[in-house]
UniProtKB/Swiss-Prot annotation:
Lineage, broadest ranks: Bacteria, Pseudomonadati, Pseudomonadota, Gammaproteobacteria, Thiotrichales
Complexes and interactors: Component of the 30S ribosomal translation pre-initiation complex which assembles on the 30S ribosome in the order IF-2 and IF-3, IF-1 and N-formylmethionyl-tRNA(fMet); mRNA recruitment can occur at any time during PIC assembly.
UniProt xrefs under InterPro entries: NA-bd_OB-fold (IPR012340), RNA-binding_domain_S1_IF1 (IPR006196), S1_domain (IPR003029), TIF_IF1 (IPR004368)
GO CC, any one term: cytosol
SUPFAM superfamilies per UniProt: Nucleic acid-binding proteins
Keyword Cytoplasm applies: yes
Described function: One of the essential components for the initiation of protein synthesis. Stabilizes the binding of IF-2 and IF-3 on the 30S subunit to which N-formylmethionyl-tRNA(fMet) subsequently binds. Helps modulate mRNA selection, yielding the 30S pre-initiation complex (PIC). Upon addition of the 50S ribosomal subunit IF-1, IF-2 and IF-3 are released leaving the mature 70S translation initiation complex.
Top-level division of the source organism's lineage: Bacteria
Family in the record: Belongs to the IF-1 family.
Protein name, UniProt field: Translation initiation factor IF-1
Localization per Swiss-Prot or TrEMBL: Cytoplasm
Domain (S1-like): residue spans on this chain: 1-72
Pfam families xrefs: eIF-1a
Keywords: Cytoplasm, Initiation factor, Protein biosynthesis, RNA-binding, rRNA-binding
Native source organism of the sequence: Francisella tularensis subsp. tularensis (strain WY96-3418)
Originating gene: infA
Amino acid sequence: MAKEDCIEMEGVVLEVLPNTMFRVELENGRIVTAHISGKMRKNYIRILTGDKVVVEITPYDLTKGRIKFRSK
C-alpha cells in the first residue's frame, strides 16, 4: 500500500502491551492498537505510558496502526 493512503494522527499511549504493541488514544477519542515502526525498533526508541506519539492508520482498518514518531 502506498504511504499517501495512510492517515496520520497524534495520540497518547494508554497502555503497553506484549510484543511491542501499545494501546493509543487518538485526538478524536478513538482508541487503537499500534505497533512500533521498523526504524524506531532498530534504534531502540523506548515508548512508555503517557508519551505523545504520531500514529499512521490505514483507511481499511481504523483499529490498528503504526507508531511513527514519539514526541518529547
